[in-house]
Amino acid sequence: MRIIGLTGGIGSGKSFVAQVAEKYFSVLHISSDEIARRQMQKGGISYKRVVEEFSGMTDDLLCEDGEINRTALSKLVMNDPVLLKKLDAITHPAVIDEINTIIAIEDERKIFSAVMVETALLYEAGIDRMCDEVWYVYAPLATRSSRLIKMRGYSTEKTEMFLKNQQPEEEFLRRSDRTVPNGEDVTESDMIKIISAYLNC
């Protein structure tokens, strides 16, 4: 079973590419963000350690229902490399373990011809080491900025902060096997053709 790592900068449209692949091809879509989010919910494998490590650093880490306030946590670690590294050390191993488990199960079931692991932190988390190939989703910076503002409701300041903290595009291109163009003018039909060509190589 082919394992594809799907990565790209914030706002590049990774989820769109993965959803098209899952809808029209024999591809299982795994989102590392969704796994990490679920694991940080109450009762999740990462919840207790995240609360223990970060609750004393901000008053609003927990929502009224006891769930982790992801916005507050993001603000806390965004501009502090030490805290970000601490958070990654908690969450990344658990996410990788679950991805490996899913892949092992699907390899036995033999339903899908490929697994597409969508993640923004492919190299940082070491997920690239489990992949047969890496696809980089590319969109112009202006397009990514527009998507974050229009689709996610980010302020201009927040958008600039996120884009500033991204890995350089040249690094993505250098380390990826294939580039998936996903600018504003790319339609679902266009994406089907792109994915089909890459899967049939």
Segments from the language model and where they lie:
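Hydrophobic anchor at the beta1->P-loop junction of P-loop NTPases
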Residues: 6
